[in-house]
């Protein structure tokens, strides 16, 4: 008997970085090229409602349940993308 495994698609850190750069650039109405992946999130100037939206949308997109604490502990695009990719 042959067993068939179904694999869920893997999200890489690079996928998350791209998603976050697009999201933040859209919210701030700036070019994605202006986004530095090592800049702490609070330096982007996102207000609290934008951060809540980011958390909800990123959780839905990635399938990884994250919260505000995850962003505080992984306070840059680079750090958060590594955290999510490891889940």
From Swiss-Prot:
Biological role: Carrier protein likely involved in the biosynthesis of a polyyne metabolite. Accepts as substrate the activated form of decanoic acid from TtuA.
Protein name (record): Acyl carrier protein TtuC
Keyword Lipid metabolism: yes
GO biological processes: fatty acid metabolic process
Gene assigned in the entry: ttuC
Record keywords, A-Z: Fatty acid metabolism, Lipid metabolism, Phosphopantetheine, Phosphoprotein
Pfam families the record matches: PP-binding (PF00550)
Modified residues (O-(pantetheine 4'-phosphoryl)serine): 48
Organism annotation: Teredinibacter turnerae (strain ATCC 39867 / T7901)
Cited SUPFAM superfamilies: ACP-like (SSF47336)
InterPro entries to which the protein is assigned, alphabetical: ACP-like_sf (IPR036736), PP-bd_ACP (IPR009081), Ppantetheine_attach_site (IPR006162)
Domain Carrier: 11-87
Lineage: Bacteria, Pseudomonadati, Pseudomonadota, Gammaproteobacteria, Cellvibrionales
Cofactor: pantetheine 4'-phosphate
């Amino acid at each position: 008997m042959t067993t068939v495994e179904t694999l869920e698609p893997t999200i890489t850190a690079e996928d998350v970085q791209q998603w976050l750069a697009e999201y933040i650039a859209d919210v701030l109405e700036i070019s994605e090229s202006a986004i530095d992946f090592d800049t702490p999130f609070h330096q982007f100037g996102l207000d609290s409602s934008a951060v809540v939206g980011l958390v909800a949308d990123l959780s839905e997109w990635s399938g990884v349940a994250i919260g505000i604490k995850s962003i505080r502990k992984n306070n840059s695009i680079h750090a958060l993308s590594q955290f999510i990719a490891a889940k």
